[in-house]
Amino acid sequence: MTKLSRKLQTQKRHRRLRRFLIGDATRPRLSVFRSNNHIYAQVIDDSAQTTICSASTVDKELREKSEKLPSDCNSSSIVGKLLAKRAIKKGIKQVIFDRGGNLYHGRVKALADAAREAGLEF
């Protein structure tokens, strides 16, 4: 039996999770994508198939503050706070957290904790 690569393991977990994580207008889905260099998060209404708001380490608002954010937990927490601020501004308090098949650890956990501290409930 061959061992799956980390990327395939992540994709397999994500497919398994997405069967149960469905966001709607009252409680949209907070989806997280983590690459080697950046982290992206967006609040999605699956029933209308629209992205309500998003934030990432390549976001224009964050690039104005510093030239390049490193790929660490501090950057992820900044993205989490920014996303929560934007979601609350649009009237969203509760979300369903979709970790994107990644383990709830490190950068993904830092983003989630920062979003909770900024006022999102999940």
Curated annotation (Swiss-Prot):
Segments crossing the lipid bilayer: none
Gene3D superfamilies in UniProt: 3.30.420.100
Pfam families according to UniProt: Ribosomal_L18p
CDD domains to which the protein is assigned, alphabetical: Ribosomal_L18_L5e
Any GO molecular function: structural constituent of ribosome
Gene Ontology cellular component terms for the protein in this record: cytosolic large ribosomal subunit
SUPFAM superfamilies documented for this protein: Translational machinery components (SSF53137)
Any one GO biological process: translation
Keyword terms of this UniProt record: Ribonucleoprotein, Ribosomal protein, RNA-binding, rRNA-binding
Domain of life the protein comes from: Bacteria
Job of this protein: This is one of the proteins that bind and probably mediate the attachment of the 5S RNA into the large ribosomal subunit, where it forms part of the central protuberance.
Protein family: Belongs to the universal ribosomal protein uL18 family.
Subunit structure: Part of the 50S ribosomal subunit; part of the 5S rRNA/L5/L18/L25 subcomplex. Contacts the 5S and 23S rRNAs.
Protein name: Large ribosomal subunit protein uL18
Lineage, top ranks: Bacteria, Bacillati, Cyanobacteriota, Cyanophyceae, Synechococcales
Originating gene: rplR
